[in-house]
């Protein structure tokens, strides 16, 4: 369910002609129908979260189509015009290079880059935020950028939780417990849920849950008997915090609300919100 302040609401898009209106309405309907509580202080925060999710999906598909290569950290490579490859296989932003330009280059010249799936997910998150921020703001927040697995910038605020309901734009993890040690990079797959039962994972592409599990199962030890599976771990950008940096020139999604209850008591412990 969706909560704005203390009101449980059912939101709907009022302008059906705005970009990705159908996709945004689908996301709103999923969130409103889920048992998980999605709590926002204002309607603008919800609008930011909605546009962020859409841009995460767009960025995932753009990265998929960019020619970006799958490589282990030992084999990783990057465009030396913008990045320096570290000894561990990460990408360190060169001095005096704006992070916005360097992130955009990954999507423009994907064939000049190769790394593993976790780093790819963080790149998608950065690109989605860049779509909603002024470049000056993005460059200030993410100066001295390092792209290396989950070692992301401290100003990128993420929420990771176990349990909850899947929403398009979520980052979820497939685990392969009996992976073949010879191909340890396939011990799991970080993916973006695109909606309509499809996921994007760097290395596996755009596939259904069943297809990703099949792909991981093909990389298990001989005589393996435990299947790969989709875990209940969900990672999201903390839109309540990151929305404060949004560009004032970014068009807001026009949302109206059908009130359901306006006296809810909202309690949050960790990353779990409960309604009384």
Curated annotation (Swiss-Prot):
GO terms for biological process: sporulation resulting in formation of a cellular spore. GO terms for molecular function: protein-glutamine gamma-glutamyltransferase activity. Its EC number is 2.3.2.13. The keyword Protease does not apply. It catalyses: L-glutaminyl-[protein] + L-lysyl-[protein] = [protein]-L-lysyl-N(6)-5-L-glutamyl-[protein] + NH4(+). Keywords: Acyltransferase, Sporulation, Transferase. It holds the Pfam family TGL. NCBIfam families: PRK03187.1. Probably plays a role in the assembly of the spore coat proteins by catalyzing epsilon-(gamma-glutamyl)lysine cross-links. Belongs to the bacillus TGase family. This is Protein-glutamine gamma-glutamyltransferase. The lineage of its organism: Bacteria, Bacillati, Bacillota, Bacilli, Bacillales.
């Amino acid at each position: 369910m969706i909560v704005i302040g203390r009101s449980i609401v059912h939101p709907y898009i009022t302008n059906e002609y705005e970009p990705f209106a159908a996709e945004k309405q689908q996301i709103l309907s999923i969130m409103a129908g889920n048992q998980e509580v999605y709590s926002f202080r204002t309607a603008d925060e919800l609008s930011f979260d909605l546009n962020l999710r859409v841009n995460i999906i767009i960025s995932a598909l753009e990265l998929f189509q960019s020619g970006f290569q799958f490589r282990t950290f030992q084999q990783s490579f990057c465009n030396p015009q913008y990045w320096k490859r570290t000894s561990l296989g990460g990408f360190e932003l060169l001095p005096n290079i704006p992070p916005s330009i360097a992130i955009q280059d990954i999507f423009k010249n994907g064939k000049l880059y190769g790394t593993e799936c976790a780093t790819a997910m963080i790149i998608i998150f950065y690109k989605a935020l860049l779509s909603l921020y002024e470049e000056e703001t993005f460059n200030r927040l993410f100066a001295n950028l390092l792209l290396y697995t989950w070692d992301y910038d401290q100003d990128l605020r993420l929420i990771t939780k176990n349990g909850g309901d899947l929403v398009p734009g979520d980052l979820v993890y497939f685990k392969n417990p009996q992976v073949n040690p010879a191909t340890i990079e396939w011990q799991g797959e970080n993916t973006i849920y695109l909606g309509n039962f499809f996921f994007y994972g760097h290395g596996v592409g755009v596939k259904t849950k069943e297809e990703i599990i099949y792909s991981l199962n093909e990389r298990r030890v001989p005589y393996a008997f435990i299947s790969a599976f989709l875990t209940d771990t969900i990672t999201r950008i903390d839109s309540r915090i990151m929305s404060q940096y949004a560009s004032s020139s970014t068009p807001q999604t026009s949302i109206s609300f059908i009130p359901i209850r306006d006296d809810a008591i909202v309690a949050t412990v960790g990353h779990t919100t409960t309604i009384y």
